[in-house]
Amino acid sequence: MSNLPSEPEFEQAYKELAYTLENSSLFQKHPEYRTALTVASIPERVIQFRVVWEDDNGNVQVNRGYRVQFNSALGPYKGGLRLHPSVNLSILKFLGFEQIFKNALTGLSMGGGKGGADFDPKGKSDAEIRRFCCAFMAELHKHIGADTDVPAGDIGVGGREIGYMFGAYRKAANRFEGVLTGKGLSWGGSLIRPEATGYGLVYYVGHMLEYSGAGSYAGKRVALSGSGNVAQYAALKLIELGATVVSLSDSKGALVATGESGITVEDINAVMAIKEARQSLTSFQHAGHLKWIEGARPWLHVGKVDIALPCATQNEVSKEEAEGLLAAGCKFVAEGSNMGCTLEAIEVFENNRKEKKGEAVWYAPGKAANCGGVAVSGLEMAQNSQRLNWTQAEVDEKLKDIMKNAFFNGLNTAKTYVEAAEGELPSLVAGSNIAGFVKVAQAMHDQGDWWSKN
């Protein structure tokens, strides 16, 4: 029996990885990798601290701050900072664990980490957010650096928060260095960074469509959840490529298209303005072509869809919703969010892939499908190191290459280690898990983090 406290989110992430490794031929071919999994599942370092700040009424407020520095075998710790009242150590360990293998799939030199605080930015003034960010960085700056740990944004941390934190770091450390990514373009940021996760997701699924013989996005109906950066830019790219976007959502409910036309660019621009003001989609003035469904996720309300892209948060597609998507004719599911599908939902998709073969749904995990965001963070780090800026076209081209490599790496690894029947699509979840794990495990072995008996 474990002596650790219950960590349901982390345990789910670990089980999902371990299950796919066990159900492949990896451990038969390389039994020594079992040791690597045991070692890799424990963070190299966990930093927990209090954040004391002053609200607009002069009252003392305190929050819990965290940084999970999970694995540095491939490079400096890399992963976002999340500000949300739900933040706890289990959630950050799950996100950091996923981040290790996601970063490995980009092909860039980045380790895995995650951090944040149980601070709720909603309803806070700009001055309160600034004071919190400065107080948070007063402790965090001791543990990060351009060659040590390079955080980025996540839920609740956008360009404004990155700016406040970077300024606090620069003053405390007396250094101007690429210690955070997602920076403003005039002070070390990269073009395409806000768009990167959404664009990368669409590029990745484009390879799924092409490989399976489903053609292009033209005429495809796509259900999206979420309404933050990932969903916004995925939706814009999908529309640009000829798809019909039929839904967006937030924690209050879902916005669903009622007709054939779908959500428009103008609708998405309006959603962007609402989210920039930190408001809910309940503020959206939807016309006759859209309807608002209070308290619901979109999956059971979108009608016929070809593609589903969860882009909101973890565990947002349940077993029942997975079955509903199959019934609605969905053929492709890819996670724009981290661990967007429950283990039961993944099982529904994977069983369908095995049973229906070429007619099946094809599922891609977040660690592969949404790695575009951290990939462009890595490109921002490279630009900072060289003291230069690449053009939008250069960054976008590099992003396309990274997503293509992530897709084929997972695909070909699945063909190597996972037995498949004739006509069966390769398991992208197994292939991506194995590819990321093997790269990290080998680097850890080479550096003496684990070893085999002679």
UniProtKB/Swiss-Prot annotation:
Keyword NADP belongs to the record: yes
Active site (record annotation): 114
InterPro entries, alphabetized: Aminoacid_DH-like_N_sf, Glu/Leu/Phe/Val/Trp_DH, Glu/Leu/Phe/Val/Trp_DH_C, Glu/Leu/Phe/Val/Trp_DH_dimer, Glu/Leu/Phe/Val_DH_AS, Glu_DH, Glu_Leu_Phe_Val_DH, NAD(P)-bd_dom_sf
One Pfam family recorded for the sequence: ELFV_dehydrog
Modified residues (N-acetylserine): 2
Any one Gene Ontology BP term: glutamate biosynthetic process
Coiled coil regions in record: none
Reactions catalysed, as given in the entry: L-glutamate + NADP(+) + H2O = 2-oxoglutarate + NH4(+) + NADPH + H(+)
Gene Ontology CC: one annotated term: cytosol
EC number(s) per entry: 1.4.1.4
CDD domains listed in its UniProt record: NAD_bind_2_Glu_DH (cd05313)
Domain of life: Eukaryota
UniProt GO MF annotations: glutamate dehydrogenase (NADP+) activity
Keywords: Acetylation, NADP, Oxidoreductase
Enzyme class: oxidoreductase
Gene3D superfamilies: Glutamate Dehydrogenase, chain A, domain 3, Leucine Dehydrogenase, chain A, domain 1, NAD(P)-binding Rossmann-like Domain
Summary of subunit composition and partner proteins: Homohexamer.
Family label: Belongs to the Glu/Leu/Phe/Val dehydrogenases family.
UniProt-recorded name of the protein: NADP-specific glutamate dehydrogenase
Species, as recorded: Neurospora crassa (strain ATCC 24698 / 74-OR23-1A / CBS 708.71 / DSM 1257 / FGSC 987)
Gene: gdh
